[in-house]
């Protein structure tokens, strides 16, 4: 993960990827995961997303992973939550990890300040589903295969609600990056059944003139 790049983006306030409102596709399609109330939902590269607030109010515990500590701090400040902060040493690479944990709407929100590749399933605990709105599309092509494998490992092949964007990558540098259906299949087809729930026209704040299609996917455990 490119720590310096993301640290600089947050420091300079260049966080156009952050949405001030809950993502409507989360509200519309989350039920397709068919999770029991109280289940734990993993939100990779979570930033300070208010989607995590929605998940807690809907009755789910949240486990977020974020590289930039100021983003995690901002989430708890903006939600008026005083977190408990604990430090750990990563068994994967020896780096220092921080876990911020607090309560919202009776649910536990646990946000890890860490490179996602430094975490293990043992560290984060059991995961019932993954909500990926802005993680896969934030990563360059050479990182995505390893990322998809890490998510598979961290979640023990839990189902995913995944949002991607598709546009002419030659007309704009990412992030967010364009991801085709063929690329998605390369990343996930070995372990998941991939179902498209919706596609619709969208826009990018940094390139309003660009033709963009947003896709919503359900990734369920491959039964083969």
Locate the predicted segments by residue.
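Class I SAM-dependent methyltransferase "Motif I" SAM/SAH-binding loop
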Residues: 42-47, 135
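Local beta-strand N-terminus motif with an aromatic residue
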Residues: 38, 109, 126-127, 135
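Conserved acetyl-CoA-binding loop of GNAT-fold acetyltransferases
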Residues: 60
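Class I (Rossmann-like) S-adenosyl-L-methionine-dependent methyltransferase catalytic domain
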Residues: 1-34, 48-52, 64-123, 148-150, ...
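A short SAM/SAH-binding and catalytic strip from SAM-dependent methyltransferases
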Residues: 116-118, 127-142
């Amino acid at each position: 993960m490119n720590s310096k790049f993301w640290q600089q983006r947050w420091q300079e306030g260049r966080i156009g990827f952050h949405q001030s409102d809950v993502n409507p596709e989360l509200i519309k399609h989350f039920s397709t995961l068919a999770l029991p109330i109280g289940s734990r939902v993993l939100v990779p590269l979570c930033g300070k997303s208010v989607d995590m607030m929605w998940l807690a109010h809907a009755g789910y515990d949240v486990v977020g992973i974020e590289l930039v500590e100021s983003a995690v701090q901002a989430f708890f400040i903006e939600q008026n939550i005083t977190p408990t902060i604990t430090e750990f040493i990563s068994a994967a690479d020896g780096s220092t990890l921080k876990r911020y944990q607090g309560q919202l709407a009776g649910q536990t929100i646990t946000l890890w300040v860490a490179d996602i590749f430094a975490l293990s399933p043992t560290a984060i605990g059991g995961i019932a589903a993954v909500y990926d709105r802005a993680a896969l599309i934030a990563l360059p092509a050479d990182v995505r295969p390893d990322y998809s494998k890490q998510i598979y490992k961290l979640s023990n092949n839990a189902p995913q609600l995944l949002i991607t964007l598709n546009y002419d990558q030659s007309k704009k540098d990412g992030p967010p990056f364009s991801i085709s259906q063929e690329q998605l299949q390369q990343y996930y087809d070995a372990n998941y059944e991939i179902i498209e729930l919706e596609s619709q026209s969208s826009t990018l704040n940094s390139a309003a003139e660009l033709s963009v299609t947003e896709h919503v996917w359900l990734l369920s455990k491959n039964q083969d």
